[in-house]
């Protein structure tokens, strides 16, 4: 089949692999991007930690908390300039507050009440005053029956607003202030490391099987016997889980400890057993690719208009 230049560019952007390698990968996988990424990884050409997607949308992520519940929302705009607009920031705050009265699902938040309108309607109405297309994109919420939900905003532009928001739920009957302090540290860790799951049991089985298949292909290239290959794959899968599972990861604040060990250590200050029951992480524009504009063409078009 014919492999287009745009497909090769997309694969290069995703993997950092060379043009000829990308062409070969696409030819071997009938032009399927995801399969081509796996093909390159199996050959040792692409790294697993290369992000499969680019972030390009603008706007803000906002967090809000009340009692033992917290929410994180994402509201998109067309330019970063609008993200610094007071009216836009106030809208994001109101949407985050409205989200607290819901279960946190994107559908529920879209229909939540903001000044007598739904969130979706409020975002549309803001277009007239702010001058750009505004849209509520997604949300998440966490709560605990007893304990705290810590929040963290990275690259903050105002209180509770920034480019990346994280929630971490800690269930405990102990000191709330100490639990909050530790929860915020874990939230900072989640912001930096971006774990896939809380525990190994929570890892998507398809994702785990996909990694295993890649490791098997890589191990077979060593030419070693099957029993050695099996042990090699077991070791690599163990390392995979250590890298993507929150509780098993080396704690960013103290890399000598895993997050789980750091939690046990934090129980001394909390004064009671504590358990991380969940986390949520929303990065602005994650999974959205904004169309790149040709500035010269825009100027020429404006001059003609």
Swiss-Prot record:
Protein name as catalogued: Elongation factor Ts
Keyword Cytoplasm belongs to the record: yes
Compartment(s) of residence: Cytoplasm
Region span, Involved in Mg(2+) ion dislocation from EF-Tu: 79-82
GO molecular function: translation elongation factor activity
Lineage of producing organism: Bacteria, Pseudomonadati, Pseudomonadota, Alphaproteobacteria, Hyphomicrobiales
Keyword Cytoplasm carried by entry: yes
Stated family: Belongs to the EF-Ts family.
Pfam families: EF_TS
One Gene Ontology term, aspect cellular component: cytoplasm
InterPro entries tied to this protein: EF-Ts_dimer_sf, Transl_elong_EFTs/EF1B, Transl_elong_EFTs/EF1B_dimer, Transl_elong_Ts_CS, UBA-like_sf
Annotated keywords: Cytoplasm, Elongation factor, Protein biosynthesis
Record's function text: Associates with the EF-Tu.GDP complex and induces the exchange of GDP to GTP. It remains bound to the aminoacyl-tRNA.EF-Tu.GTP complex up to the GTP hydrolysis stage on the ribosome.
UniProt superkingdom: Bacteria
